[in-house]
């Protein structure tokens, strides 16, 4: 993550304009104490001491956007009863544009009532409609989006399967976004993702990705297969899978991907975390951030929100504070090859010498560290090309790697001698070397110059190859064998 770029983006939030389309709800919280059992039945009695009523569903996306200071408009259908009018009033109080709202006498505005005691949610009651909106309401919403799209920098779609987001409406919204060059970012729901076909970006969680793709996710490889299958099936530019304690994984149409570790320190309530992710990713794209940086910021925001109880939001000050306290320099070192190519071109123009090496680095040991330190001393910047999990399996067999590519990348990025880490999926780093064009290509002393992949390419544009002696007796294979021997000995 480029921290300066993010800071500049946060300073411009007030100028961004977002349209939120989706299922609006009221989130009601009843806070109390449980100190006795009911005489009527063997159940706890909750003595309510505090009540809270908030915008929920797509309304929590609005909460996030308003808290962040940007300009917000909404398009949806509500019931005409008390809750619908109350929700409208809450939107007006937040200065949200409501010209896209419709009201239906036959519809029940969604209200979710949660009972909390001793810091835990005990029960939830739902009152809502789930039937699709009618054709007239659908046409009115589509016309509103089409006529007003030029006023917005991003369209955020929050689907809770309550009937507002029909397939025809979604396809109309996505088509308008493409025509106008406006990103359409969707937080999806359900198992039929055909209605999201052609969207700019989807933000399903891990379970939703499993259901939509039909592929059980048990490791990084199955996650990749599920993501790629889903993207191809519904013609997606980008898929961003939120993975709770495992962070966020982003998959791009060009085959590249990036993985971000979780930023949560303590988790009290995951309610609304997906809304925070949708809000920050959407605003990031609207503000010109690369997807990976928008996702990294959203990851930080979600980490803040899950540390709060109830449907919560994050503000700019909290984001600044989190960026100051988290070790974001590690994340900023892990790059996609195309973005890293651009960075290295700038550094070379500044007179910097780029050193490149590559490997699996499964079970990092002292031999690795000394090798990397020596490589770094050969130039100004050390770039490490890291074999992906799939690449290692092809090279070393199905039992490897022991450490996932995401974890290996972050361990290596924590080393001060490494400036950038880039994961590659090919069997050799030749294509990556051709993209990055390093000045110095480094391999271990167990190679000869003639056996180094990329030697001819690097020398063809004036670069050179360097071989570094390895530490005797230090290898991942030796460590594994030693562990197994000692385990067998008891």
UniProtKB/Swiss-Prot annotation:
Catalytic activity: D-glycero-beta-D-manno-heptose 7-phosphate + ATP = D-glycero-beta-D-manno-heptose 1,7-bisphosphate + ADP + H(+); D-glycero-beta-D-manno-heptose 1-phosphate + ATP + H(+) = ADP-D-glycero-beta-D-manno-heptose + diphosphate
Residues that, per the record, bind ATP: 205-208
Region Ribokinase, residue ranges: 1-330
Region span, Cytidylyltransferase: 356-490
Enzyme class: transferase
GO terms under cellular component: cytosol
Pathway(s) this gene product operates in, as recorded in its UniProt entry: Nucleotide-sugar biosynthesis; ADP-L-glycero-beta-D-manno-heptose biosynthesis; ADP-L-glycero-beta-D-manno-heptose from D-glycero-beta-D-manno-heptose 7-phosphate: step 1/4; Nucleotide-sugar biosynthesis; ADP-L-glycero-beta-D-manno-heptose biosynthesis; ADP-L-glycero-beta-D-manno-heptose from D-glycero-beta-D-manno-heptose 7-phosphate: step 3/4
Span of the signal peptide: none
InterPro entries from the UniProt entry: Bifunc_HldE, Cyt_trans-like, PfkB_dom, RfaE_dom_I, RfaE_dom_II, Ribokinase-like, Rossmann-like_a/b/a_fold
Keyword hit for Chaperone: no
Pfam families assigned to the protein according to its UniProt record, in alphabetical order: CTP_transf_like (PF01467), PfkB (PF00294)
Keyword Transmembrane included in the entry's annotation: no
GO terms classed as biological process: ADP-L-glycero-beta-D-manno-heptose biosynthetic process
GO molecular function, one term: heptose 7-phosphate kinase activity
Its EC number(s): 2.7.1.167, 2.7.7.70
UniProt keyword terms in alphabetical order: ATP-binding, Carbohydrate metabolism, Kinase, Multifunctional enzyme, Nucleotide-binding, Nucleotidyltransferase, Transferase
Active site: 275
Family statement: In the N-terminal section; belongs to the carbohydrate kinase PfkB family.
Function according to Swiss-Prot or TrEMBL: Catalyzes the ADP transfer from ATP to D-glycero-beta-D-manno-heptose 1-phosphate, yielding ADP-D-glycero-beta-D-manno-heptose.
NCBIfam families from the UniProt entry: cyt_tran_rel, rfaE_dom_I, rfaE_dom_II
Subunit structure: Homodimer.
Protein name (database record): Bifunctional protein HldE
Organism: Syntrophotalea carbinolica (strain DSM 2380 / NBRC 103641 / GraBd1) (Pelobacter carbinolicus)
Gene designation per UniProt: hldE
